[in-house]
Amino acid sequence: MFDTSVFIYALGGEHPYRAPCRAIMSKGVEGLLAGEASIELIHEFAHVRARRGVDRRTAVADARHIADTSRLHTVERADVERALELWSEHEQLDMRDAIFAAQALNRQINVILSPDRGFDGIEGLQRIDPADDDAVASLIAA
């Protein structure tokens, strides 16, 4: 499961995560990395891009590209219920990330690709840092 930050860093300005996140996006486009994402990721991505001054046409084109190269999951009631539980149990987790974690867990997806340490410590969910080349390579090989 992708976290929004992978795409924000990949398409954003200079940052230590920019190159690893761009490489991940390339692997997704090439079909080497099966990308799972929440429909909420598209919303968050477009909102953040527009808020950072990217014109809407570009933000829409970028969001469509992500949607086209990811398997999108809608938010179901069970996801909301589980997200609320996760959010109450993990103080470091914000609510949108709790939704992403719940969606992953409810779909037996046990990995989230994210630099955000807020996902650490969630039972049944392993966070893989985009800058961890070996861990990312293991996803491609899987």
Description of each model-found segment:
Residues 22, 44-71:
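Active-site-proximal, substrate-binding regions of enzyme catalytic domains
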Residues 11, 49, 123-126:
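Short, flexible helix/strand-to-coil boundary loops that buttress conserved ligand/catalytic motifs
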